[in-house]
């Protein structure tokens, strides 16, 4: 339902950008409320923080359509919502976090957003390591 909510606010979104949006939603939520929203764990991969097993995650949702597109001679997968999010699943505090991240990230390109995530100590300290990024690193976020 979080994916549908984000796609409802942002429209068609590439996987690369969605990975970072989910990271920022969960880590900002943890910093502000002590709880993440999605229940996902994140790893610091070469191109930024991503949900663990993200490559399998998006295909598990019937309401999310994936389309392969060629962008600057590179294959990218875009995500499209085929349904509506049930907004009653989210508390007002959760919606405030989701809204803040989507509002800030919506106008950014996937590439710019990826570069921004590379400024985060949470990514820098864990890139290339097999462990997940600890949620305590939410307190070191610099871009939100």
Feature-to-residue mapping (PLM):
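Domain-edge interaction signal
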Residues: 1-144
């Amino acid at each position: 339902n979080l994916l549908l909510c984000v796609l409802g606010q942002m429209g068609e979104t590439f996987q690369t950008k969605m990975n970072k949006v989910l990271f920022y939603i969960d880590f900002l939520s943890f910093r502000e409320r002590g709880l993440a929203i999605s229940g996902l764990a994140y790893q610091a991969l070469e191109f930024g923080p991503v949900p663990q097993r993200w490559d399998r995650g998006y295909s598990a949702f019937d309401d999310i359509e994936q389309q392969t597109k060629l962008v600057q001679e590179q294959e990218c997968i875009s995500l499209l919502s085929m349904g509506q999010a049930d907004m009653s699943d989210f508390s007002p505090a959760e919606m405030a976090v989701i809204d803040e991240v989507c509002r800030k990230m919506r106008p950014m390109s996937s590439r710019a957003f990826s570069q921004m995530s590379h400024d985060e100590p949470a990514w820098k300290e864990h890139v290339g390591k097999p462990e997940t990024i600890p949620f305590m690193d939410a307190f070191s976020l610099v871009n939100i």
